[in-house]
């Protein structure tokens, strides 16, 4: 008599599993997200054998002293894109598992195809496609004018078969496009389900560690822009990056959200052209492409992205509201942060906007999360309210507290130096960030309170 297939109940939100169904997940506290998954033992490969092969640890494990472990830096190889290397922490580490996500049409497959075509001339690579046919990939490579003579292609969705072929080919870098269409034979659920995504990602990660193959997995995203699939998917990989960009903009930003071999929140900027993605070596010049006409409601701030400063322009529009509840719209900034700053401006700046619609936008599609943009945002709103432009050679940064104090931000000297390189001659910064020796030809105003910043603005 055949044994009944094993059953498990898995949460679709976080990937936690349970022996029986329950209404609420105990891990993420979400309701009605637990579904049944049937598991059947593989008829040809025992579990211990499978774990000790492609997905398991090679050889016999042994205990080692931490002091005996070599401290030599892991060797890296370049992707051929300096911006991509920057986001990865300096290049690709052999044996690492990388997950790249992004909206449909952002350019994930294009970026990886360009990368592998460049690297195929120097080392052995393998591009595994599960969503497109080989003819479709070849047509895109031909349209972009990429060298394809040395690139190895494979159209397959079975993880076991892919690892068998990779064992024979022994590539240095392998791309899986995408992880949501891959499946394992001993998991009786459809590709893209929580169980399939979790097990296939873990299988590939262990294969990368034991064989020294760098694997890049393409992942889908949800409606809110986060990576689809269980959270355990992001836990088991070494590096998670997200390729983002508006549909009406040709610029794409690549940002690292997790990196075991480098800095997180590192930013790389690309431009989508007819020849594919091209890296932008000086992003500040693009985000600051302003016209000669001076307009109110515009200010320039210096944000810190990963390991480098970036100059971006923030725009604000304050107009009389025709509705009982004025609108507050923030694009590229946190909505709650805008509400806090409006309250601080009313309480400590004496300017109330309760009857005004307020719209703010970060130019270029950049998403700013750090609080160093507070002071620039406030001055942009005041500029729009008074219809008085800020000087074009003025740069602003600083955090604003609830008591109206201007708090210092990290790397103040580097931010000021970056602004001076781009021709800015005046700066309003926190008093604690004023350098002992400002850049030549630059006038730096240090402020401690919001009232001080408004006073400097009046005197400009």
Swiss-Prot record:
Q: Which GO terms describe its biological process?
A: recombinational repair
Intervals of motif RadA KNRFG motif: 258-262
- CDD domains on file: RadA_SMS_N
* Enzyme Commission numbers on file: 3.6.4.-
What does the UniProt record say this protein does?
A: DNA-dependent ATPase involved in processing of recombination intermediates, plays a role in repairing DNA breaks. Stimulates the branch migration of RecA-mediated strand transfer reactions, allowing the 3' invading strand to extend heteroduplex DNA faster. Binds ssDNA in the presence of ADP but not other nucleotides, has ATPase activity that is stimulated by ssDNA and various branched DNA structures, but inhibited by SSB. Does not have RecA's homology-searching function.
Tell me what this protein is called: DNA repair protein RadA
Q: Which gene encodes it?
A: radA
Q: Member of which family?
A: Belongs to the RecA family. RadA subfamily.
